[in-house]
From Swiss-Prot:
Protein name, as recorded: Flagellar transcriptional regulator FtcR
Disulphide bonds in the chain: none
GO CC terms: cytosol; protein-DNA complex
One BP annotation, GO: regulation of DNA-templated transcription
Xref: CDD domains: trans_reg_C
Organism: Brucella ovis (strain ATCC 25840 / 63/290 / NCTC 10512)
Species classification: Bacteria, Pseudomonadati, Pseudomonadota, Alphaproteobacteria, Hyphomicrobiales
DNA-binding region(s) in UniProt: 127-226
Gene Ontology MF term list: phosphorelay response regulator activity; transcription cis-regulatory region binding
Length: 227
């Protein structure tokens, strides 16, 4: 899930629609609401956030540090002003990257993925996706590849696979996966739907790989395990 902070409801709603077309859930906040939320959100919920997108708002300068107090997810600022000085200021405030409008959400997703690669990972990461064993994921709306061949998954299953690979080495519980895929405020869908998605995903991966790469332990959660 991606959190968008902007003074304008029209902007946060627009991002929700655009990211939704790529299968990505977003939640929008005004700066005031964001302050209240980031102060009280449970640890497991904020750890499910994949990135923060900071738009035009009076508190743009202090939000990166506020986020860093709770989370290490990528922070990207959207610069509405064609000003080099403002772009440099945003980097000084502590953002990981700055994009200028107009920008496609797939470019934002690619930049998020690039920030993660620079942070370091055990999987092979490059300009064209992240490779873990025979599986390559792209995290920008494209279907994953298995042994170099495109393999389409339903949107939710694809997002779960991307999330597991992005968090390789960590065991993720059902709540974390649900929050990342559906958003932390979605009360219309039951968390148990995650088990159904993962069951279908495991069956498909097993059919392609000849083994089950998703390790599960009761009460502890799931992790992807490929030598």
């Amino acid at each position: 899930m991606i959190v968008v902070v902007d003074d304008r409801d029209m902007v946060t709603e627009g991002y929700s629609s655009w990211f939704g077309r790529e299968g990505i859930t977003t939640t929008g906040f005004t700066p005031t609401d964001f302050d209240e939320w980031v102060e009280s959100v449970p640890e497991q919920d904020i750890m499910a956030i994949e990135a923060f997108l900071i738009g035009e708002c009076a508190d743009q300068h202090r939000l990166p540090a506020r986020i860093r107090e709770r989370c290490k997810a990528p922070v990207i600022a959207v610069n509405d002003r064609p000003s080099l000085e403002h772009t440099l200021e945003l980097f000084q405030f502590g953002v990981d990257d700055v994009v200028r409008k107009p920008v496609h959400v797939r470019e934002i997703l690619a930049r998020i993925n690039a920030i993660r690669r620079r942070a370091g990972a055990s999987a092979t990461s490059g300009a064209d996706g992240t490779q873990l064993g025979p599986i390559r994921v792209f995290s920008d709306g494209r279907d994953p590849q298995i042994n170099g061949i495109d393999f389409p998954f339903p949107r939710r299953e694809r997002r779960i696979l991307e999330y597991l690979i992005a968090n390789r080495g960590r065991r993720l519980n059902k709540v974390q996966i649900f929050s990342a895929i559906y958003g932390i405020f979605d009360s219309e869908v039951e968390e148990n739907v995650v088990e159904s998605h993962i069951s279908k995903l495991r069956k498909k991966l097993r059919g392609q790989l000849g083994f089950d790469p998703i390790d599960s332990k009761r009460f502890l959660g799931y992790c992807i395990n490929i030598e």
